[in-house]
Amino acid sequence: MDFESNYSLIKNTSESAAWSSKLPQGLDLEVSHHPITMRHIANLIIAMERLKGGEGVTMGTEFKDKDLLNFLLESAVEEHIVLELESAPPASRRAAGFSSTSQYECSVTDSENKCWVLMNEAMELHAMMLQGGSSYHKVHLNLSSYVTPVPIETEARPVALGIKGSNLYLSCSKSGGRPTLHLEEVADKDQLKSISQQSDMVRFLFYRRNTGVDISTLESASFRNWFISTDMQQDYTKPVDMCQKAAPNRLTTFTIQRHN
C-alpha cells in the first residue's frame, strides 16, 4: 500500500515535536494535507498502527482493524440519531390541529346499564333502562376518531359523536356559567374533518380515555376535567350532561359497543 500521498515519515525533526508524545520513540509523523474523508482518516490510522508494529510494538491488545470498524459504525449511528432529534414537523402540520381518520357506528350505556335515548322535542339525550321491545329507542351514534400531528395525550383519543341518520352532534359549551352538553346541528359535516386547536369547533370533540375493555370516559376537549355523565338514579327526567370527575350521584364511565 502506498501511503506517501497521505503522510511522510520524518526522523528526529523539530517540526514533528507535537507528535513525539503520541508515537513510539524514534518515529515522527507529519500530515502533508488535511484529510477530507473518513476513508483518508481510516487509512492514516491503520498506517500508523502498522508502522508501530514494524518498530517492534505489538498490536495484540492495542488498536485493531475491527476496533476501527466499530468506531466508524458507532459514529454513523450517533450521527443518524442527531439528525432524527433535530428534525421537526413542518409548520403546516403543527397548525393542522385535529384530523378525522376513521368512523364507526356504536351505542352507549352507562355503568348502570342505562341506554342513551333521544328526546326529540327537548333536543336532549336521556339515560333510560330499556327492556324487551323498547330497545329500538336506543340511540345509535357515529363515532369519529381523530389524530393530531403532535399527540396531546398518549392515553386519550379525540372523538366526535354524532346521532346516526341526522346532522346532530354532541358538543360542550358554557351555559349558565358552567359547561353543559348540547345537541347541535352541523349542516356541513366536512367542517368536522379537520379542526384547528384554536377553533371553537373543538367544542364537538371529547377525549375518550379507556378504563377497561370497551369502558371509557368522555372528557370535553374545550373544558378539561369536565366529563359526559348520567344521573346515578333512574330519573328519566334528567338529561345526559357534563360534570366534574368527583361529582356525587353522577356516572362518568360508559360501555361503548361497536356495531360495525
Swiss-Prot record:
Signal peptide: none annotated. GO terms for biological process: cellular response to lipopolysaccharide; cortisol secretion; cytokine-mediated signaling pathway; fever generation; immune response; macrophage chemotaxis; neutrophil activation; positive regulation of cell division. It comes from the Eukaryota. InterPro entries: IL-1_fam, IL1/FGF. Pfam families: IL1 (PF00340). It is found in: Cytoplasm, Cytosol; Secreted; Lysosome; Secreted, Extracellular exosome. All three isoforms are expressed in gill, kidney, liver and spleen. Isoform 1 is also expressed in blood. None of the isoforms are expressed in brain. GO terms for cellular component: cytosol; extracellular space; lysosome. Keywords: Cytokine, Cytoplasm, Inflammatory response, Lysosome, Mitogen, Pyrogen, Secreted. Monomer. Potent pro-inflammatory cytokine. Initially discovered as the major endogenous pyrogen, induces prostaglandin synthesis, neutrophil influx and activation, T-cell activation and cytokine production, B-cell activation and antibody production, and fibroblast proliferation and collagen production. Involved in transduction of inflammation downstream of pyroptosis: its mature form is specifically released in the extracellular milieu by passing through the gasdermin-D (GSDMD) pore. Belongs to the IL-1 family. This is Interleukin-1 beta. It comes from Oncorhynchus mykiss. The lineage of its organism: Eukaryota, Metazoa, Chordata, Craniata, Vertebrata. The gene is il1b.
